[in-house]
Amino acid sequence: MKINTVLFDLDGTLINTNELIISSFLHTLHTYYPNQYKREDVLPFIGPSLHDTFSKIDESKVEELITSYRQFNHDHHDELVEEYETVYETVQELKKQGYKVGIVTTKARQTVEMGLKLSKLDEFFDVVVTIDDVEHVKPHPEPLQKALQLLDAKPEEALMVGDNHHDIVGGQNAGTKTAAVSWTLKGRAYLEAYKPDFMLDKMSDLLPILSDMNRS
């Protein structure tokens, strides 16, 4: 089956938001729980929804913690977000070649739009599924299924690209092929354990992979 659709995670995949996310967590946690959390303590928080993460910390303050996190995140967004090499050129080429491209993210839409605008990727994506659009987040298949439906695409004709196990398992649950990115903050071996179909060392690796898949 040939691939005609590519779905991307956003944070840590298309744009480098690692420092923004870590700083947002540390600011929030230091505000409410001084001197209890270090940088390495918040790395596992990258990937799950804010609600899931903060529920495990303090169920009585979830909404308060989310509000604090998002305020810091918005205020420092543009200074802390960076680009990944070859991302813009690769997505541009995928569109040029006629691929359907979409984003499936656990972020809120407002912050997603900020990131896409800053990285100039906003012109390429017709479909962006955020946490605001679904009841269940990755690795549940719902977000991917929604994106595929909006793109009029079939799972077996799609590839999910991401930096976290939520993306890889989410793709597997939805029936797509999967590609993990080796630049994940959690390390290459972490993602290899989830057996993605492909491992990308840079985003442009996607182009020959898709070419080979569609040649067979």
Curated annotation (Swiss-Prot):
A Pfam family it matches: HAD_2
Catalytic activity: diphosphate + H2O = 2 phosphate + H(+)
Reported cofactor(s): Mg(2+)
Gene3D superfamilies named among the record's database cross-references: HAD superfamily/HAD-like, Putative phosphatase, domain 2
Protein name per the record: Pyrophosphatase PpaX
Family: Belongs to the HAD-like hydrolase superfamily. PpaX family.
GO cellular component terms listed in the entry, alphabetical order: cytosol
Keywords: Hydrolase, Magnesium
Provenance organism: Bacillus thuringiensis (strain Al Hakam)
Keyword Transcription: no
Task of the protein: Hydrolyzes pyrophosphate formed during P-Ser-HPr dephosphorylation by HPrK/P. Might play a role in controlling the intracellular pyrophosphate pool.
Active site as annotated: D9 (nucleophile)
GO molecular function per UniProt: inorganic diphosphate phosphatase activity; magnesium ion binding; phosphoglycolate phosphatase activity
SUPFAM superfamilies: HAD-like (SSF56784)
InterPro entries named among the record's database cross-references: HAD-like_hydrolase_sf (IPR050155), HAD-like_sf (IPR036412), HAD-SF_hydro_IA (IPR006439), HAD-SF_hydro_IIIA (IPR006549), HAD_2 (IPR041492), HAD_sf (IPR023214), PGP-like_dom2 (IPR023198), Pyrophosphatase_Ppax (IPR023733)
PANTHER family membership: PHOSPHOGLYCOLATE PHOSPHATASE, PYROPHOSPHATASE PPAX
E.C. number(s) listed in UniProt: 3.6.1.1
A single BP term in Gene Ontology: DNA repair
